[in-house]
């Protein structure tokens, strides 16, 4: 059986992303993992990726030839071999725990051994513009549905159903929340600070969106105006339509912010307008890189060059990455006031070979 169709993975991951949000000026480190059982084809496939803000920096795929945690950002490549040995060891331990958990959960739900099943996990921490801890989180899903989640107090759990209640009782007896809280408030924050400092030229940059508007007649009476924002970073952006100065959010078709494949992002928002009334509509673009919002209006005489090939290529790449690497199109909100600049102290050098503990959060269900 194939690991999973791109559309299925996209839906599962976007559903998980909707559960999280960051504050203005904050930074985040998040790990995403997926285990998929393959009856009759050997071990489950396990994929894990790590993100700092909107940038993927590490990746592991149990089907890859290297069988190692691999760098995905230039600034993480400077870590010593001991770091990569440690990260590989932890992520492999995580995959083995998930292998056991897949069997356990199949029993909880009285499922046969013939079907393929999926475990997903997201965990991480946020820091403010001063580098101090804001919050931590862990969320687990089974077969695309919520299973169990760490509450905001970092001391208790919310179980989604009766099967998850079994896991909740086990984890409470093992004091797993206390162990996880210590990691999220301590080591997770230290490594996030280190990564922000080492990768500040990339992680704390801003790339202004390249904007334009397109027009497509759908009938003799109506046309679609589409407002494009391309090649921007970070991912948080707002596109809004107005008619004669009045908000048109209810009538706007808006897509999720999507990675372009080159470290930047793209997004569009569209409205259907009566033919001949295009001039009454304006698109407003807000992004951290802009000193003030941009306002776009359709000009009938303009003939914009629409980079359709580039856009499609970016979306195809996005689908391929989702299918092969199980990443998330990270779109946590951050506003412009506090994000620029800032210096983050690194984790103590004595810990440099340990890495962020991606095995701690893998506990048997």
Curated annotation (Swiss-Prot):
GO terms for MF: peptide antigen binding; signaling receptor binding
Signal sequence range: 1-24
Segments of this protein annotated with the region Connecting peptide: 299-308
Positions of post-translational Phosphoserine modification: 343, 345, 349-350, 352, 356, 359
Membrane-side (Extracellular) residue stretches: 25-308
Ranges of Low complexity composition bias in the record: 342-359
Membrane spanning residue stretches: 309-332
UniProt-listed Pfam families: C1-set (PF07654), MHC_I (PF00129), MHC_I_C (PF06623)
Location in or out of the cell: Membrane
Carbohydrate attachment residues: 110
Alpha-1: annotated segments: 25-114
InterPro entries found in the cross-reference section: Ig-like_dom (IPR007110), Ig-like_dom_sf (IPR036179), Ig-like_fold (IPR013783), Ig/MHC_CS (IPR003006), Ig_C1-set (IPR003597), MHC_class-I_related (IPR050208), MHC_I-like_Ag-recog (IPR011161), MHC_I-like_Ag-recog_sf (IPR037055)
GO terms for cellular component: early endosome membrane; ER to Golgi transport vesicle membrane; external side of plasma membrane; extracellular space; lumenal side of endoplasmic reticulum membrane; MHC class I protein complex; phagocytic vesicle membrane; recycling endosome membrane
Keywords: Disulfide bond, Glycoprotein, Immunity, Membrane, MHC I, Phosphoprotein, Signal, Transmembrane, Transmembrane helix
Modified positions (Phosphotyrosine) in chain numbering: 344
Record-stated family: Belongs to the MHC class I family.
Function summary: Involved in the presentation of foreign antigens to the immune system.
The protein's name in its UniProt record: Class I histocompatibility antigen, Gogo-A*0201 alpha chain
Source organism of this protein record: Gorilla gorilla gorilla
């Amino acid at each position: 059986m194939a690991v999973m169709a791109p559309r299925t993975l996209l839906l599962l991951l976007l559903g998980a992303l909707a559960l999280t949000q960051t504050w203005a000026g904050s930074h985040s480190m998040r790990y995403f993992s997926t285990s998929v059982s393959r009856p009759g084809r050997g071990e489950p496939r396990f994929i894990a990726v790590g993100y700092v803000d909107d940038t993927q920096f590490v990746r592991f795929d149990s089907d890859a030839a290297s069988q190692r945690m691999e760098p995905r950002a230039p600034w993480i490549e400077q870590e010593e071999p001991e770091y990569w040995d440690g990260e590989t060891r932890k992520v492999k331990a995580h995959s083995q725990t998930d292998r056991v958990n897949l069997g356990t959960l199949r029993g909880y739900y009285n499922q046969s051994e013939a079907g393929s099943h999926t475990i997903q996990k997201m965990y991480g921490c946020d820091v403010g513009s001063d580098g101090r801890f804001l919050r931590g989180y862990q969320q687990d899903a089974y077969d695309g549905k919520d299973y169990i989640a760490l509450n905001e107090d970092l001391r208790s759990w919310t179980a989604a159903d009766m099967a998850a209640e079994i896991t909740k009782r086990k984890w409470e007896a093992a004091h797993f929340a206390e162990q996880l809280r210590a990691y999220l408030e301590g080591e997770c924050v230290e490594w996030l600070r280190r990564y922000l400092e080492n990768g500040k030229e990339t992680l704390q940059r801003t790339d202004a969106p390249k904007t334009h508007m397109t027009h497509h007649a759908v009938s003799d009476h109506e046309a679609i105006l589409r407002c494009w924002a391309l090649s921007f970073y970070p991912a948080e952006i707002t596109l809004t339509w107005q008619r004669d100065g009045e908000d048109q959010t209810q009538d706007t078709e808006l897509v999720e912010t999507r990675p372009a494949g080159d470290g930047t992002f793209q997004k569009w928002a569209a409205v259907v307008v009566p033919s001949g009334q295009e001039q009454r509509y304006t698109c407003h673009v807000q992004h951290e890189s802009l000193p003030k919002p941009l306002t776009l209006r359709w000009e009938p005489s303009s003939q914009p060059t629409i980079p359709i090939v580039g856009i499609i290529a970016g979306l195809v790449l996005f689908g391929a990455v989702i299918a092969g690497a199980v990443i998330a199109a990270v779109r946590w909100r951050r506003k412009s006031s506090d994000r620029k600049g800032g210096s983050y102290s690194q984790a103590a050098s004595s810990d440099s070979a340990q890495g962020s503990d991606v095995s701690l959060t893998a506990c048997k269900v």
